[in-house]
Amino acid sequence: MQAEIICTGSELLLGYVQNTNADYLGHELAALGIEVVLQITVGDDWKIMEQAVREALERVDLVITTGGLGPTTDDITKDVIAAVLGVPMVTDDESLAQMREYFARRGIEMPDIFIRQASFPYGSRIIPNHKGTAPGALIERDGKVIVIFPGPPRELRAMFETWVKPYLLEIPGRGEVLRTRVLKLTGIAEYAVQEILKELGDLVNPSLGYLAMPGEVHLRVNAHAVDPAEAERMVEELTEKVTGLVGEYVFAIDDEVPEKTVGDLLLRKGLTVSVAESCTAGMVAARFTDVPGSSRYFIGGVVAYDNDLKREVLGVPAEILDRYGAVSEQTAVAMAEGIRRLTGSDLGLAITGIAGPDGGTRAKPVGLVYVALASARETLCQRLLLPGVRKAVRIGTVNSSLRIVKSFLNRQA
């Protein structure tokens, strides 16, 4: 089964709004075994939109539109589809009543302009919208299916999961399903990951996809099969081989939030942590405290850019700074032990490095970072050489720091 996605809205064409709906729908449809052959974006132009819908219905079995369901005159998606199908627009009384109730719950009388949101092409099956005011619709016509979604991603996703996905699962002949696992790596460049994984040979199905982002590389493991269980097995098998080669760089899998994973481990083990940061300037502390309830295990942090602060607050000996410099294993270790001593936390995490673009030398290049972790029993330190510009180095340092803490906690009894 093939599908086409038509995203509407001049704000998308002008770049004012990021089109996350197409990404979401493409991924979800592929997982159902539905091939998306084309995704286009059109503005609020009747003639262009009408042409796009007509051509899509000639090409594919499933046409999905997003956006253009609002109450204003430039919201024309349903009217265009009605014209293409040659059917009138009709008001759905139940949708209208639900919309009036939506406004009533907020103590507002529904403006008349919203009435048009309850009008649909004749023959539509209404898709309720419990997250907003604009319902969607599903139309079956001559062996084709048209699904009409509102534009806000929060509304679209809820409607897809609740109503459209179950409908699509009942359609026979959807083809092979796609199963995916995303490994998120840090501390290594995209080309270096590809070089390491060359020994796996030429992969077709399952396959690997690469996406470089600031401070991390997303490695996508994909597999297609008619049987979902077989696709899962193929993904698991290749994932195991991949992690055997680059597992030391993996800091998260799929939608895992590493700071939450680390926080859960700290809570489970009854431990606390504090942070001393130089080149990341509070970014690690911010990630820890992005998690609600992190005060149960995160004590606090110190941003110590200046060497005087490293000495006076963290207790880094002057002789260490003079002999080895601020960016060194010795300084990182002293910072980690110092923040642990200062705050009374069980673990002390410290970061010092050269984020660039200036400050690097042949001996200490831009991207050189030391991450130290101190506990009552030992102090560990890792030397990192991170690729990219300043932003990438700092994000990579944060991700690597969380990976180091996670690895340490997983080794503890």
From Swiss-Prot:
Pfam family, one: CinA
Protein name stated in the entry: Putative competence-damage inducible protein
Residue stretches spanning the membrane: none
Cleavable signal peptide: none
InterPro entries from the UniProt entry: CinA, CinA-like_C, CinA_C, CinA_KH, Competence-induced_CinA, MoaB/Mog-like_dom_sf, MoaB/Mog_dom
Family annotation (HAMAP family): CinA_B (MF_00226_B)
Family according to the record: Belongs to the CinA family.
Organism: Desulforudis audaxviator (strain MP104C)
